[in-house]
Regions:
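Catalytic glycan-binding domains that act on GlcNAc-containing polysaccharides
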Residues: 1-109
Length: 109
């Protein structure tokens, strides 16, 4: 999700007001933000990932599965082609392959 949403940039802000690694829109998730988070709590990577993971977990539960939950999280619930979920899952696979190659090279050394 982070790779697709922000390209791993913790200071990313969208024109829609989404902030941080997981591109959380503060006005929709005020109740999930810490009271002592300062003016821009979602630009803190730890806070952003905690809130984003909670939002994603709720979305998966509410929508009945990973693909549907990802679609809702990405604001694309009505996309019949499930392009957002496909992008996220492709990014996950790419990262898993890169990690496996890295481990393989490390064990060869």
């Amino acid at each position: 999700v982070i790779g697709v949403e922000s390209g791993f940039n913790p200071l990313s802000e969208s024109v829609m007001g989404a902030q941080g690694l997981m591109q959380i829109i503060p006005r929709f998730h005020q109740e999930k933000l810490p009271d002592d988070g300062g003016d821009l709590p979602l630009l803190d990577p730890i806070t952003n990932v905690h809130v984003g993971a909670r939002v994603l977990k709720e979305s998966i539960r509410r929508n009945g599965g990973l693909t549907e939950g990802l679609q809702q999280f990405g604001g694309a619930a009505n996309d019949p082609d499930r392009r957002y979920a496909s992008r996220v899952l492709a990014e996950k696979q790419r990262l898993e392959q890169a990690a496996a190659q890295s481990r393989s090279r490390a064990s060869d050394s």
